[in-house]
């Protein structure tokens, strides 16, 4: 199932990143993602962090590092991408992009509803 609104190059990027992670080339996948989003790559380390010992993985913002509780998670796309999202959100550029995108969507939804109501009112006056 294709995600609506995605162009072919973004679909290809997503598929390639998942393939790289499954193939054990997680560092390359993180580099590809970071290049795409224009942010630094996070470090990747197998180990645990105090207060987060029971989770599969966690992202530590001040270290810019993804910790995996077990080495086998390095080939798990869901775990890696979930933690990468935290890295993306914590980067200034990532935060700004997400906030701006959400703000644009918020405004667009209001304007779209206004336009729909205006068109409906004009249709009823005929």
Predicted regions, residues:
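Short pre-active-site segment immediately N-terminal to the catalytic Zn-binding motif
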Residues: 64-80, 93-98
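Post-HExxH zinc-binding segment in Zn-dependent metallohydrolases
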Residues: 97-126
């Amino acid at each position: 199932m294709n995600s609506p609104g995605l162009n072919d190059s973004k679909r290809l990027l997503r598929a390639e990143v998942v393939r790289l992670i499954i193939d054990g080339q997680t560092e390359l996948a993180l580099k590809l993602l970071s290049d795409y989003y224009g942010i630094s790559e996070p470090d990747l380390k197998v180990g645990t962090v105090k207060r987060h010992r029971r989770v599969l993985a966690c992202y530590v913002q001040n270290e810019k590092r993804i910790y995996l509780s077990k080495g086998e998670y390095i080939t798990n796309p869901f775990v890696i991408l979930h933690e990468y999202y935290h890295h993306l959100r914590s980067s200034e550029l990532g935060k700004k992009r997400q906030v701006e995108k959400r703000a644009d969507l918020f405004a667009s939804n209001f304007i779209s509803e206004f336009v729909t109501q205006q068109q409906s009112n004009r249709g009823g006056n005929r």
